[in-house]
Design a protein with these regions (language model features):
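Glycine-rich active-site loop/strand segments that organize a redox cofactor
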Residues: 70-115
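Short, low-complexity intrinsically disordered segments enriched in A/P/G/S/L with frequent Arg
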Residues: 7-8, 14
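Predominantly flavin-linked oxidoreductase catalytic cores and closely associated redox partners
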Residues: 142-229
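Glycine-rich FAD pyrophosphate-binding loop
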Residues: 45-63
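N-terminal Rossmann-like FAD-binding beta1-loop-alpha1 element of flavoenzymes
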Residues: 27-51
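Redox-cofactor binding/interface segments in oxidoreductases and associated redox assembly factors
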Residues: 30, 65, 178-179
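Feature captures the FAD/FMN-dependent oxidoreductase FAD-binding
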Residues: 99-175
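Residue-level detector of alpha-helix initiation sites
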Residues: 29, 33-34, 58, 182-184
């Protein structure tokens, strides 16, 4: 039986019993967070057939809690000179392809009200759900198929691309994007899946460490600091 091509429609549904046959698509993106949604709408906007998968029951959970619930979605001073990196050339090429002004234009297109808080930080006037809704609307307009509550069991490199065993059944694709994020906030669904896939395909893994943590001090140290200020 040949693999059937699905019509590019958005489906915000859990997998069904009949989804057990081999299906084919051009692009599979694993992870429906900010990166996965942007990747999906960009690829589909260029005419690719895109299937976006996530093991959670909702897309963009971290978007909803970001910025204290108002989503600090970009910074007006997002420039290569303001980044620290072992490979500054990557930053230059990435920001040249898509700038903060491109995203601000997308926000304006959808009529999302926002303001500058300080030092170029841009926040929604209302709620983070405005940004999530914007990304989902963009995905809808270009025909991204979103499937939630979908787990990936195995990934295999094949001649035509990649073969995935999922709770949807087998999925074959030409291009595969892993956009599952890091390990932070496991209560929102973060796992080490992306690291496992990277290791499976022979990529070098660097030790992870926290990038944003609370700073706490003891009462005794606080009293000492009062006399040094």
């Amino acid at each position: 039986m040949g693999a059937s091509r699905l019509a590019p429609t958005v489906c915000f549904v859990a997998p069904h019993q009949e989804d057990t046959v081999l299906r084919s698509t051009e692009v599979v993106i694993i992870g429906a967070g900010a990166a996965g949604l942007m990747c999906a709408l960009t690829a589909a906007g260029r005419g690719r057939q895109v299937l976006l998968l996530d093991h959670a029951n909702k897309a963009g959970k971290k978007i909803l809690m970001s910025g204290g619930g108002r989503c600090n979605f970009t910074n007006m001073y997002t420039e290569p000179a303001n980044f620290l990196s072992q490979n500054p050339h990557f930053c230059k090429s990435a920001l040249a392809r898509y700038t903060q002004w491109d995203f601000i234009g997308l926000v304006a297109k959808h009529g999302v009200p926002y303001h500058e808080k300080k030092l170029g930080q841009l926040f929604c006037d209302n709620k983070s759900s405005d940004i999530l809704g914007m990304l989902l609307d963009e995905c809808d307009q270009v025909g991204v198929e979103l499937r939630l509550d979908t787990s990936i069991q195995t990934i295999e490199k094949v001649e035509s691309g990649y073969l995935l065993d999922t709770t949807l059944g087998q999925v074959q694709c030409q291009s595969l994007v892993i956009a599952t994020g890091g390990l932070s906030i496991p209560t929102l669904g973060a796992t080490g899946f992306g690291y496992q896939v990277a290791k499976q395909f022979g990529h070098e893994l660097l030790p992870t460490r926290a990038g944003l943590v609370p700073f706490t001090i003891t009462d005794q140290l606080k009293d000492c600091l009062l006399y040094t200020s």
